[in-house]
């Protein structure tokens, strides 16, 4: 089924220009949304919790910073860009008591609405504007007169304005310059979680670690194992990102290309595909999110345990040592330590 693509000519920028927008959160996406909205002639304030380290950054950028509750009371469009695990609490404590008839509540990701962790009143427009790129890219492309493609969706539309409002907002952050794709909260949420868990984060992470273990256990130097299964990953991913799998195969040696064809199906077997389907089923049923919420309520012991296990894996110590040799590689964790 062909997707619908919408552009600036399809959007009415005056819709969002006529609203007062509170951006809740000033992280990667929050700073980009706020600055692009302001440059597009939209009245914007930033909502942050008391004591947030982002307050100074937002004020230095020229924004008025309010508490989450005061920002919600002031605005008639609220974009909630806090972390997924914080959104339900922010909504119930700060936003919900301050919602007014006709307000719109927007999200950058559909998880909390799709899995009903947040349930706005029926008189509230609920939509999503999700750029398919990190905030710094959204901002840079906007400044350059371009844009990052956006997904939009509507979950509640009491006034029949949801799609037009979401499209107007997407245009104001540059998305309609590149293309805006209407979708649903369900589709965005479930495919996003699946991609993260099966390929981008969980799958890739464990593929690299297992490859490292096989080489190290076979007697090869850990440094060589790191180079071959992790360091060179960026080279390959960049080729795929730029031109697809065909471009990657075109760009590598014939030896590497043939080896990939021969060995790939031995690693990613039909059983692996069945495991992927099982992960998708856990996402669709809500099991993953229920488990995540339970972990958050318990103080995140599971998340902390997983982090400790990864930090203790020898691939991390080996990588840290080797990256010290690479002056062109900067570790963001070093800057926040």
From Swiss-Prot:
Binding site for Mg(2+) 2: 192, 228, 232
Record's keyword terms, sorted: Amino-acid biosynthesis, Branched-chain amino acid biosynthesis, Magnesium, Metal-binding, NADP, Oxidoreductase
Record-linked SUPFAM superfamilies: 6-phosphogluconate dehydrogenase C-terminal domain-like, NAD(P)-binding Rossmann-fold domains
Span of domain KARI C-terminal knotted: 184-329
Protein residues bound to substrate: 253
Binding site for Mg(2+) 1: 192, 196
Database matches in HAMAP family: IlvC
GO biological process, one term: isoleucine biosynthetic process
Short name of one Pfam family: KARI_C
Binding positions for NADP(+) per the UniProt entry: 26-29, 49, 52, 54, 84-87, 135
Entry-linked NCBIfam families: ilvC, PRK05479.1, PRK13403.1
A GO-annotated cellular component: cytosol
Catalytic machinery residues: 109
Name of this chain's protein: Ketol-acid reductoisomerase (NADP(+))
Pathway per the UniProt entry: Amino-acid biosynthesis; L-isoleucine biosynthesis; L-isoleucine from 2-oxobutanoate: step 2/4; Amino-acid biosynthesis; L-valine biosynthesis; L-valine from pyruvate: step 2/4
Similarity field: Belongs to the ketol-acid reductoisomerase family.
Enzyme class, spelled out: oxidoreductase
Cited InterPro entries: 6-PGluconate_DH-like_C_sf, KARI, KARI_C, KARI_N, KARI_prok, NAD(P)-bd_dom_sf
PROSITE patterns in UniProt: KARI_C, KARI_N
The protein's role, per its UniProt record: Involved in the biosynthesis of branched-chain amino acids (BCAA). Catalyzes an alkyl-migration followed by a ketol-acid reduction of (S)-2-acetolactate (S2AL) to yield (R)-2,3-dihydroxy-isovalerate. In the isomerase reaction, S2AL is rearranged via a Mg-dependent methyl migration to produce 3-hydroxy-3-methyl-2-ketobutyrate (HMKB). In the reductase reaction, this 2-ketoacid undergoes a metal-dependent reduction by NADPH to yield (R)-2,3-dihydroxy-isovalerate.
Cofactor: Mg(2+)
Top-level taxon: Bacteria
KARI N-terminal Rossmann domain ranges (all copies): 3-183
EC number: 1.1.1.86
Cofactor note: Binds 2 magnesium ions per subunit.
Molecular function per GO: ketol-acid reductoisomerase activity; magnesium ion binding; NADP binding
Organism for this UniProt entry: Corynebacterium diphtheriae (strain ATCC 700971 / NCTC 13129 / Biotype gravis)
